[in-house]
Amino acid sequence: VTPEKMEKGIYKKFSFFKDQVEVSPKTNKMILPISIKETSSKTIYRKSPKSEKTIIEGVNSSGIEEFFNTGDMLGTILTDVFSDVNIYDDDIRLLQRRFVSPIGRGAISFYKYYLMDTVMVDRQECVHLTFVPQNSQDFGFTGHLYVVKDSTYAVKKCTMNLPKKTGVNFVDNLDIVQQFEQMPDGNWVLTDDDMTVELQFVKGIQGLEVQRTTKYSNYNFEDIEPRLFRLKGNVIKEANMLNKSDEYWASVRQVPLTKKESNMDVFMNRIEQIPGFKYVIFGAKALIENFVETGSKKHPSKFDFG
């Protein structure tokens, strides 16, 4: 959203759109939050025999997705595009492409590194390095590494950026910030994993900024009950995951919602009151879902088309 756009179109006609605009903490650009999804989960891992399962304890969402039957529409799209990033892998699979990790085995021949300074990161002395692809035409990251200045040479923090010139479809910019902490037993673990992507699907049409913030905590290396690994599937969804209270989310939420994110339900209710909005959603449903409801929440229909 630009200051010019704030003075025309829907922002001028419906002032509550302008009231919903905020400054992104990730890019410092003005944005209009339209969707938010929170997931609280627990991951268990066994080395031998190898097994890993994720138990989803709570899911909370609000925003534009509520108007579609496929309520996880945006989440499904993003899951298909994004994947977890492990900088300790030799290659990073992201945006349906493969990138050389800045600390992978092939990194030295792919990237150029520059020693910048010695800095403090969370009270730990670190060596600050920057890196760029050896060949500016190569498909790779630019970024910063903060390496602990001791015998471990562990990565304390890593930031990676995918420049627009890289040529990934629809992606104007992508930023990844990861931070690590050392456990009492000496192991280093990932604690913060933030990804921000700016998408532009059609030139001249308002783009999207998507933020994925992941926090890891409560690491425990004690033995896990064997029965948990006998649960079927790699992802287990608790029966009441969609019915968690506000008190539950207040207790597990590690990043507080912004004022505008907290106001999402009110904002969506006001959008529903806009004349003609239901026809826009009707057309969008037909296009996106290939399915059209003939009823409403208050008056469900026995017949749908799809």
Model-derived segments and spans:
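Surface-exposed, low-complexity/disordered segments
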Residues: 1-111, 122-124, 184-306
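Extended beta-strand-rich segments in extracellular/periplasmic secretory proteins, especially
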Residues: 92-148, 152-159
